[in-house]
């Protein structure tokens, strides 16, 4: 998935945790804000205001990797972006991120 991080600076990964017979859903969502109440996101200056009649465009590209070479290429691109930076995984919501 490719998108402009300056225009879509937030990214959410979520899953539906209902029973398996109900189906399993996961979401990977670039966004202008986090999935919190609008008032909370507004307080944290993450609400994009669009004037009446105005539009805002975002570009998003999704690639499907159908063979080992394509998968290896995607893995290399990710490794190049990560460099030597280790991932940070938090055990609890961080201040300012979650209502």
Task: Tell me the role of every PLM-derived stretch.
Residues 1-99:
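Beta-strand-rich recognition/accessory modules
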């Amino acid at each position: 998935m490719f998108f402009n991080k300056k225009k879509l600076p937030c990214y959410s990964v979520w899953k539906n945790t209902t029973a398996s017979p109900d189906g399993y859903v996961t979401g990977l969502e670039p966004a202008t804000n986090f999935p919190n109440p609008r008032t909370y996101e507004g307080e944290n200056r993450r609400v994009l205001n669009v004037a009446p009649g105005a539009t805002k465009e975002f570009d998003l590209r999704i690639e499907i990797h159908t063979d080992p070479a394509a998968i290896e290429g995607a893995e290399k691109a990710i490794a190049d972006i990560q460099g030597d930076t280790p991932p940070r995984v938090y055990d609890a919501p961080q201040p300012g991120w979650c209502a």
